[in-house]
């Protein structure tokens, strides 16, 4: 309702400006600039837009990707973003692993979802803490509670012939340089893709590397609703609603992904429909579905539409393997949950 009201006010203001422009020269100039703005934006779009990956590594990656485990399978005392979680995912049928990649203050890459870790004595923010300190934290509890390094995770996936999707929650040029060097060193262009929410990060990734597969994660309520709760108050909620409106129509029209050179869209099951999937495919963009919870959703998107899917719990959704009852381990540290 509020976004529609804002658009209505904008249209009324432009109409009022047009009426006043009949009398005032300055307003005629302003109105002319406003009316030529769409033309200028169209020209800039055509000149600055980036192309998605055209090489064969795109087909190779997606031909080998169908069941994607969301940070591994966390059953029993196993935690996500750990080697045991990756191992359980492989045993339960996954062919690809999503992992969160962050960089410490001294340039060490680690696999961790939250941007900080709380202990009884202090809070450690990842990009402000050295690896020597992070490596001593027992984040998950038990005997294997230390943080997994990026190189360890990649080595395991390579040894077990698993494709990888590296999710970048926090972007930096140093992080991108490390990822590119790792890909070139191990020849991983047909085994790796990166994903991000950040539009600026997506643009910088494509400008830097035209072979690296890049995906954009999006959801129609990404900014206005977090963990089922509305963001902001009665005075600021309109801003988050406007951001969601901008993102929604930017994605649905394919303007944003086409401009950034995105190779695939990671779309929530609530926002996915056949029209978007077909239009994306016609534009050279693949679709990956996430947030699936029912067998009906799985049958439609995975079996009928033949789309790759990101699965949080392979056992419950696909009925693969057996998981032991979940028993939360004791832990001396607690992770501050961040937006996945």
From Swiss-Prot:
Residues 323-333 have a biased composition (Low complexity). GO terms for biological process: ethanolamine metabolic process; N-acylethanolamine metabolic process; phospholipid metabolic process. Residues 321-340 are annotated as: Disordered. Keywords: Membrane, Signal, Transmembrane, Transmembrane helix. GO terms for molecular function: glycerophosphodiester phosphodiesterase activity. SUPFAM superfamilies: PLC-like phosphodiesterases. This is Uncharacterized protein T09B9.3. It comes from Caenorhabditis elegans. The lineage of its organism: Eukaryota, Metazoa, Ecdysozoa, Nematoda, Chromadorea.
């Amino acid at each position: 309702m509020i976004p529609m009201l804002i658009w209505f006010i904008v249209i009324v203001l432009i109409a009022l400006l047009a009426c006043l422009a009949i009398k005032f020269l300055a307003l005629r100039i302003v109105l002319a600039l406003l009316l030529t703005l769409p033309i200028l934006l169209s020209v800039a779009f055509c000149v600055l837009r980036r192309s998605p990956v055209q090489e064969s590594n795109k087909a190779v990656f997606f031909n080998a990707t169908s069941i994607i485990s969301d940070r591994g399978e966390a059953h029993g005392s196993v935690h996500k973003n750990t080697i045991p979680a990756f191992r359980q995912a492989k045993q339960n049928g996954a062919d690809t692993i999503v992992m969160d990649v962050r960089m410490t203050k001294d340039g060490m890459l680690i696999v961790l979802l939250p941007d900080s870790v709380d202990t009884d004595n202090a809070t450690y923010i990842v990009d402000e803490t050295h690896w020597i300190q992070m490596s001593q934290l027992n984040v998950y509890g038990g005997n294997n509670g230390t943080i997994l390094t990026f190189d360890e995770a990649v080595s395991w996936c390579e040894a077990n012939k698993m494709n990888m999707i590296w999710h970048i929650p926090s972007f930096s040029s140093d992080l991108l340089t490390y990822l590119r060097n790792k890909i070139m060193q191990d020849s991983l262009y047909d085994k790796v893709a990166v994903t991000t929410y950040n539009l600026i990060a997506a643009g910088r990734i494509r400008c830097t590397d035209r072979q690296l597969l890049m995906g954009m994660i999006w959801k129609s309520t990404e900014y206005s609703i977090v963990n089922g709760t509305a963001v902001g108050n009665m005075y600021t909620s309109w801003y988050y609603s406007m951001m969601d409106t901008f993102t929604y129509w930017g994605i649905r029209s394919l303007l944003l992904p086409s401009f950034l050179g995105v190779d695939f869209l990671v779309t929530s099951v609530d926002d996915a429909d056949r029209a978007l999937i077909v239009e994306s495919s016609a534009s050279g963009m693949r679709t990956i579905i996430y947030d699936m919870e029912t067998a009906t959703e799985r049958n439609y998107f995975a079996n009928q539409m033949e789309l790759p899917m990101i699965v949080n719990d392979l056992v419950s959704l696909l009925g693969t393997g057996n998981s032991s009852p979940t028993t939360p381990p004791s832990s001396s540290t607690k992770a501050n949950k961040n937006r996945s």
